[in-house]
């Protein structure tokens, strides 16, 4: 059901973004006036969602294994429909979101019934890469080929079109080539994790990385499946907002 909670958690702390620096760090002023430093898992340019002085949400999770007790989870950004929209910027969360969506049955119509899910399985020509999720279909599935599934957290939009990537990504280009490489013995699936509820479709970010756009279209022609999944981000939960169509070009 659209709008149903997929992940729930204790309420996040809200604050104001002071600055993001050294790629991994963000200073946030809490409601109390205290300024804390949070880990930023998104090391890219964060096009359209990085707004010093804007509202953000961070999670407090102190641990002796972590240098920082805070993690930056969400940012408030201009919405495609006007007003503001909360965006999930923690790239480390995307795989868990897609896995939860599969386990909840939200992708059954496109993937078929799934018997098992494994994470970070080695693959590729030199077996040096790791696929985000490796799916084993149910024995009763009409297509019993194993599924290699790559997840891409997507936060950049133009109008209501979600775009990935927002910068040149040689790693992302490599992932497309490796997905093509598992065909036809296996299914190859690219899942853009649309981490904001205000998008209507997905396309490759040609203006940011023209080569990625070329490889994206080559992958589609080769048989790679693209399944954009949309989510809503809230203070204490993330909701399922359904599938979105794919466009082959940004323009």
UniProtKB/Swiss-Prot annotation:
Lineage start: Bacteria, Bacillati, Cyanobacteriota, Cyanophyceae, Synechococcales
Disulfide feature: none
Record-linked InterPro entries: SfsA, SfsA_C, SfsA_N
Family label: Belongs to the SfsA family.
Gene Ontology molecular function: any one: DNA binding
Alphabetized Gene3D superfamilies for the sequence: 2.40.50.580, 3.40.1350.60
Name of the protein this chain belongs to: Sugar fermentation stimulation protein homolog
Organism in which the protein naturally occurs: Prochlorococcus marinus (strain MIT 9313)
Transmembrane region(s): none
Gene field: sfsA
